[in-house]
Amino acid sequence: MVCRDKPSEPCVWTNGDGLWIRGAIRALHGSTPSIRAAGARAIAITPETGDSPRNFKRDHRLDLEILSDLDLGVSLSFGLVSVMPAEIKSPLLQRGLDLSAPHGFSFWMLPMPATYVLDQRGIIHRACVGPDSITEATTETVLAALSELDGPQPRP
């Protein structure tokens, strides 16, 4: 898992695709100072590849890590992937919308929205998964979960 790079630091990461992830990233960015003050780091994970995540970070002046989930490896490992049904895929393709194109793979699977609070060992202590995660993963919820972790003391 991505947080194991720095085993002494808890982290908050958010996962998703398209418009949802862009809104979630902006919300996570707004919480980043509080998350850092709690001794953790904020990470966003998107299946988008190429320059898109980097450009989004630059254009919105975001101060957090944005990582690409190539081939949905992280999302699959957490069971956070849904397969796009043929009855939805076909009309989208007829309109010229190929949801797999920005991801760099040909299969039509999308990550489910999720926000996790992980401790310094990479163990999940709070999970907000699915459509409700948009309203559940508030700054207050995340900070409350971080305050319950046994880990580094909050930064002054």
Which sequence ranges carry the predicted segments?
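Chalcogenol-based redox active-site neighborhoods
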Residues: 1-156
